[in-house]
């Protein structure tokens, strides 16, 4: 009887340990924003521990800030840059053209994109060796130094 009780206790402790480990790596997110020169940027980072797993950017650009007036001019101006983001595994990019602004949505899945592709992307800033992963703490520090503010939930 004592052996059965001891076995049950050990099993209970093991189950609790597994549950605590599983809860310890909970996925979280932080959002940062910046309005500058007619462009509103909202960046959302999804991370586990200190490792960023996904980043989503939404950039709203007024045509007047780009020195143009129409969505046709915007399409012509942004087409070449947008094409550089296409057909890369782990990356989705789209631009929606409105009457007075363009809204770009960019999503990077760091669990799928290669570090070589990541280094080639226009406008991507990073410090350190990206092949080892993206640090949430370093990303937050870099964003705040560029003027981004954290958006409280």
UniProtKB/Swiss-Prot annotation:
<feature type="signal peptide">
    <location>
        <begin position="1"/>
        <end position="22"/>
    </location>
</feature>
<feature type="lipid moiety-binding region" description="S-diacylglycerol cysteine">
    <location>
        <position position="23"/>
    </location>
</feature>
<comment type="similarity">
    <text>To E.coli YehR.</text>
</comment>
<keyword id="KW-0732">Signal</keyword>
<dbReference type="GO" id="GO:0005886">
    <property type="term" value="C:plasma membrane"/>
</dbReference>
<dbReference type="InterPro" id="IPR036699">
    <property type="entry name" value="YehR-like_sf"/>
</dbReference>
<feature type="compositionally biased region" description="Basic and acidic residues">
    <location>
        <begin position="135"/>
        <end position="153"/>
    </location>
</feature>
<dbReference type="InterPro" id="IPR009736">
    <property type="entry name" value="DUF1307"/>
</dbReference>
<keyword id="KW-1003">Cell membrane</keyword>
<keyword id="KW-0449">Lipoprotein</keyword>
<feature type="lipid moiety-binding region" description="N-palmitoyl cysteine">
    <location>
        <position position="23"/>
    </location>
</feature>
<protein>
    <recommendedName>
        <fullName>Uncharacterized lipoprotein Lin0239</fullName>
    </recommendedName>
</protein>
<feature type="region of interest" description="Disordered">
    <location>
        <begin position="121"/>
        <end position="153"/>
    </location>
</feature>
<dbReference type="Pfam" id="PF06998">
    <property type="entry name" value="DUF1307"/>
</dbReference>
<keyword id="KW-0472">Membrane</keyword>
<keyword id="KW-0564">Palmitate</keyword>
